[in-house]
């Protein structure tokens, strides 16, 4: 698939019959997989991304064995390249399939052990699925790395996240820990965050709680809808 090209006139160049593979839902490396992986270990993650996006077939056992044998090479890659590829992989349409594919899940967990809660996407009701589909990368990462340990702090230390995005993740994490896993909080807490940190922080916290909750909490859903359309008042100096 990666070897299909088009010129400025729209003429298609497909030297390895990638178009046919795409129709069949067949994902594989060009040539010797072991050699191709060693040329760039990031291709392990690219295989997972392409498999989740295009494959209609099961994994090739021999190929998976070669991927696993080369996993140590991932440590040679820069953190920026790893994060960039993770952003391409962590798409709402991929997450449910990823969380149900044992092989993809195992490989991702070995490469990114900080994504401890990736299984959360395996059982989404319609409301949770809608939230996930409308969420950006940073919120999706928050769902996977935040727990009652310092796991999210380590993820932020390990990868180069912008200060703005780092603040978003920390806000959810701190609120989670301060409120005992969101067991104790009320509208007053949310209002305070709205006025000090803005709408995005409130929606992040509420949507995080909705997705993490085992039961549907109508009060949370109502709050989320309220703050979605709420405008922060401008206080005169």
Name each model feature, range by range.
Residues 1-157:
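Glycine- and charge-enriched loop/helix tracts that form the active or gating conduit
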